């Protein structure tokens, strides 16, 4: 006689408690299995517990042919050989709500903050997107978006409210000024208007995108009409909705074209790379007054224009492009390796790499 199987049904609260310890990438795979799992992944209770208890993963994404891809960059040392690879492991699918056939959106630029992607499209639209939960919010402008606009996504550290910064450089005024607006997710509207004078963010490579660290965004900027070495670190504080000028390491003068920014794992620390001397500096302490303590982390014996930090300081691995807009990468560990990204098209290029930390954070709710 066959024994009857005893089916154990877990309460939804217990399921949420269990899943709050599972990585966001693993939970994202559950969305396609059933409507119930899809709804649970988007549940506010799970999002809050997951933020507190789940392991955080630092991954890499890249923009290729207007699509966002996950990239696996591996550099492992064995006894007799080094195992290294850079492969595209998956594509994030962002459907266009204006398309009857739900075609995918053509993405121009991507900005990452705490698991959310702020994407500007080639037809000048703006969307905030969580690839893990599939949640999106299309942001309507007060006035039409422009190709020249600069965008950043962050959050208020006091209220945990998401916000978007939009900057528009007004070149028809003398002196040149940068007008900016701030979108508040709680009110679902553009609430702040301001003008920032005396600064300039050149349109050079990927430097114009800025980087998010603990909710705030940082750029390398120049003093308006100043010499090329009159450079400073510009911060937009989403708690005060204002700009701050911060200090850079001052031991070696260099021009704007010789410096780039990156972040360590999970957007915890800001990094500055100086191609003149090939030095990597890490911001170890940031004061509200604008002062920053910098520590020199690494020095390389070759010239690099822009670098992405992919590993922590205990086992440093750095990646940079062999040539701009190419699919050839340098991987730097104990030695230098040049590899080609394994991708679907030999003609496709990797314009830049971004550190991406998946999460279940909800766009409509607080972080």
Swiss-Prot record:
Q: Which SUPFAM superfamilies match?
A: F-box domain
Q: Name one Pfam family in it.
A: FBA_1
* Domain of life from the UniProt record: Eukaryota
Q: Which residues cross the membrane?
A: none
Q: Which parts of the chain are coiled coil? A: none
Domain F-box: start-end pairs? 4-50
Stated name of the protein:
Putative F-box protein At3g21130
């Amino acid at each position: 006689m066959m024994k009857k199987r005893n089916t154990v049904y877990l309460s939804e609260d217990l399921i949420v408690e269990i899943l709050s310890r599972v990585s966001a990438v693993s939970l994202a795979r559950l969305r396609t299995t059933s409507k119930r799992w899809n709804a649970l992944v988007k549940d506010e209770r799970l999002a809050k517990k997951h933020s507190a208890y789940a392991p955080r993963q630092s991954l890499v994404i890249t923009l290729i042919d207007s699509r966002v891809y996950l990239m696996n960059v591996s550099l492992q040392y064995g006894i007799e050989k080094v195992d290294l690879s850079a492969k595209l492991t998956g594509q994030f699918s962002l459907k266009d709500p204006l398309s009857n056939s739900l075609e995918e959106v053509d993405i121009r630029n991507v900005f990452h903050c705490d698991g959310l992607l702020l994407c500007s499209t080639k037809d000048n639209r703006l969307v905030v997107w969580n690839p893990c939960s599939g949640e999106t919010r299309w942001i309507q402008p007060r006035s039409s978006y422009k190709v020249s606009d600069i965008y950043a996504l962050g959050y208020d550290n006091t209220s945990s409210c998401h916000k978007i910064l939009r900057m528009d450089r007004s070149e028809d005024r003398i002196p040149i000024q940068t007008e900016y607006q701030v979108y508040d997710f709680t009110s679902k509207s553009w609430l702040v208007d301001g003008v920032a004078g005396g600064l300039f963010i050149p349109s050079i490579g990927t430097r114009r995108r800025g980087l998010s660290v603990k909710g705030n965004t940082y750029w390398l900027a120049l003093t308006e009409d100043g010499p090329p070495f009159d450079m400073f670190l510009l911060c937009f504080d989403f708690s005060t909705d204002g700009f701050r000028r911060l200090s850079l390491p001052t031991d070696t003068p260099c021009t704007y074209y010789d410096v780039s920014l990156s972040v360590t794992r999970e957007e915890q620390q800001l990094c500055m790379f100086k191609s003149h001397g090939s030095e990597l500096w890490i911001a170890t302490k940031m004061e509200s007054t604008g002062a920053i303590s910098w520590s020199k982390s690494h020095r390389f014996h070759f010239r690099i224009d822009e670098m992405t930090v992919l590993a922590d300081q205990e086992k440093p691995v750095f990646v940079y492009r062999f040539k701009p807009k190419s699919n050839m990468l340098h991987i730097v560990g104990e030695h230098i390796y040049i590899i080609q990204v394994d991708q679907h098209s030999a003609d496709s290029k990797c314009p830049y790499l971004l550190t991406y930390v998946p999460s279940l954070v909800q766009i409509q709710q607080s972080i």
